[in-house]
């Protein structure tokens, strides 16, 4: 696991009404488990790329055993990384939230939401963590960014400043909390995570 900084100055994002502005108003400390390599790595079992693709379960529909293997792999990763993040944060506890998928909550099959379910299960098993995995719920479709380039992003808009507030319900339970926000894949300049972080800060 590595630590880095999500920088406000690199979070320039389009505004819905035109122009650009920073999606994130302050720098944020972040962590990642491993680098994402493009190409055909998603086809290679046990890679981070394969794990992410399996949990999305949208390009290829995976059998239950493959999904179970992904759940077990992610569980192992989280049980190592989460306590280390808590230690490095210096906090007594962290509320764990999850970046929602791009489409509205009720448009996914249960087996497309195993990433969040796995994070929830591990969070409930570890000391020092509060389950906030359902604090951010998507109610309006946005474009699926990892499919948008191929023209298969579906209904909804690509990221703009304020898209999280416009398309998600955010629980008041996040107010005043130290939050660990988890996403399966962070892509600099896309600004999905930056906008969601700012929405939580504004709450």
Where are these regions (language model features)?
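Active-site-facing substrate-recognition patch
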Residues: 2-95, 103-105, 109, 141-175
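Charged helix-capping and loop-helix junction motifs
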Residues: 111-117
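Hydrophobic "anchor" residues on beta-strands that sit immediately upstream
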Residues: 178-180
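A short, conserved beta-to-alpha structural element at the edge of catalytic cores
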Residues: 194-203
